[in-house]
């Protein structure tokens, strides 16, 4: 399975693509989409650049699913609104590409990657480097995106296991209650 992770931002959006085969993780690609070349006041232009960039990444790497960071509420409401709009452009591009979208908070990703939710960016970079056996540290935005993809790979495996257990429990319950297996 191929997973595309997205760390949305209005100036810099990180992306990371990994392949998952059972418990094996393999690095495919990562990078950033920068909107700094567009004037700060041209919000629609920046959002279009993000949409087009994520659409291009999805088209090039053909992921099966995606994972996106959930926006946190910032002290500055204007910053939160702008980040939310960037996230909206990312979500729209992913859905437009026909991808399922899973959402994780930064805290969930950090906890999944390092064991605690208050990890520094450098710790995320190092764990991504180790888990994907990269020769060097990825940039912070790309590392966060790869971390989201890895988090989704682990969460997806856990969710599949839970679904199997739930199905087994339903079957046992059906046998016990009704005498039949459905």
From Swiss-Prot:
Keywords: Cytoplasm, DNA damage, DNA recombination, DNA repair, DNA-binding, Endonuclease, Hydrolase, Magnesium, Metal-binding, Nuclease. GO terms for biological process: DNA recombination; DNA repair. Binds 2 Mg(2+) ion per subunit. It holds the Pfam family RuvC. Its main location: cytoplasm. GO terms for molecular function: crossover junction DNA endonuclease activity; DNA binding; magnesium ion binding. Its EC number is 3.1.21.10. Its cofactor is Mg(2+). Mg(2+) 2 binds at residue 69. One of its GO terms (cellular component) is Holliday junction resolvase complex. NCBIfam families: ruvC. Homodimer which binds Holliday junction (HJ) DNA. The HJ becomes 2-fold symmetrical on binding to RuvC with unstacked arms; it has a different conformation from HJ DNA in complex with RuvA. In the full resolvosome a probable DNA-RuvA(4)-RuvB(12)-RuvC(2) complex forms which resolves the HJ. Belongs to the RuvC family. This is Crossover junction endodeoxyribonuclease RuvC. It comes from Delftia acidovorans (strain DSM 14801 / SPH-1).
């Amino acid at each position: 399975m191929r997973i595309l992770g997205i760390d949305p931002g209005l100036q810099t959006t990180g992306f990371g693509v990994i392949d998952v085969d059972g418990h094996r993780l393999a690095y495919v690609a990562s990078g950033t989409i920068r909107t700094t070349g567009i004037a700060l006041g041209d919000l629609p232009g920046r959002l279009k650049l993000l949409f087009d960039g994520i659409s291009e990444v999805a088209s090039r790497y053909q992921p099966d699913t995606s994972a996106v960071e959930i926006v946190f509420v910032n002290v500055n409401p204007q910053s939160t609104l702008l980040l939310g709009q960037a996230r909206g452009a990312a979500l729209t591009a992913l859905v437009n590409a026909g991808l399922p979208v899973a959402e994780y908070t930064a805290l969930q990703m950090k906890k999944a990657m390092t064991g605690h939710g208050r990890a520094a960016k450098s710790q995320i970079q190092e764990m991504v480097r180790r888990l994907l056996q990269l020769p060097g540290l990825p940039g912070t935005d790309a590392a966060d995106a790869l971390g989201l993809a890895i988090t989704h790979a682990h969460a997806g495996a856990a969710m599949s296991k839970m679904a199997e257990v739930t199905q087994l429990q339903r079957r046992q319950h059906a046998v016990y209650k009704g005498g039949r297996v459905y």
